[in-house]
A protein has these predicted regions:
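Proline-centered turn/helix-capping motifs that create local helix->coil transitions or kinks
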Residues: 1-4, 38-44, 59, 74, ...
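Hydrophobic alpha-helix immediately C-terminal to the catalytic Tyr-X-X-X-Lys motif of short-chain
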Residues: 26, 30-34, 69, 134, ...
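C-terminal substrate-binding subdomain of Rossmann-fold SDR/epimerase-dehydratase oxidoreductases
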Residues: 73-181
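Residue-level signature of the cytosolic catalytic core of signaling kinases
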Residues: 15, 23, 58-62, 127, ...
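Heptad-repeat alpha-helical coiled-coil signaling segments
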Residues: 53, 57-59, 85-89
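Catalytic helix-loop patch of NAD(P)-dependent Rossmann-fold dehydrogenases
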Residues: 1-54, 61
Length: 181
């Protein structure tokens, strides 16, 4: 990542030093290889879309920030933050979904198809905050005045995730007119 512009755009070289980031790169490589192998002579648009860290309805998985916060708020468990200082591009689930629909509409209406294209749908720069800052925001705005137990675990081992993750969505904003609200 460029230290002068610490936001990943669609043209950044793919690759990562952690399994999660590498899995995201693999999706891009596999999609591009399918397009080139099976669809290069056809007028079919194949794109990939990347979103920030999506939060909101429908997220029932284990170790997820919003469901875990709500469980802690209801007294069902302590809130465990693995990496409280890590910065993520948080966005509400419907924001990138709107972008995906705008992208699908554009790709459907185009007369010529680009061989392969990636798109970012990311929050505003001010929404790139640390995990602990996100929780503090929840605490400030919560309806119930329950005191929740926050148990912070800082792992002193080899880093498995990127400390600061930011996406540049200028392409989506400029070409699609999309914006995170």
């Amino acid at each position: 990542i460029n230290k002068n512009n610490p936001y990943y755009n669609e043209n950044h070289p793919l690759g990562a030093s952690d399994p999660y980031g590498t899995s995201k790169s693999c999706v891009e490589f596999i999609t591009e290889s399918y397009k080139k192998s099976f669809f290069k002579d056809r007028n079919i648009s194949i794109v990939t879309a990347r979103a920030g860290n999506v939060i909101g309805g429908g997220d029932y998985s284990e170790d997820r920030i919003v469901p875990d916060y709500l469980k802690a708020l209801n007294g069902k468990k302590n809130l465990v933050l693995r990496n409280p200082e890590y910065v993520r591009p948080w966005q509400y689930v419907l924001e990138p979904l709107y972008g995906y629909l705008a992208l699908a509409k554009r790709e459907t209406l185009k007369k010529t198809r680009k061989l392969f294209s990636a798109w970012n749908f990311a929050p505003n720069q001010s929404d790139n905050v640390s995990v602990i800052k996100l929780i503090q925001c929840f605490q400030t705005n919560k309806i119930k005045k329950n005191k929740i137990n926050i148990k912070i675990i800082i792992k002193k081992q080899i880093e498995k995730e990127t400390k600061i993750l930011r996406l540049n969505a200028n392409k989506s904003k400029k070409i699609l007119g999309w914006k995170n609200k």
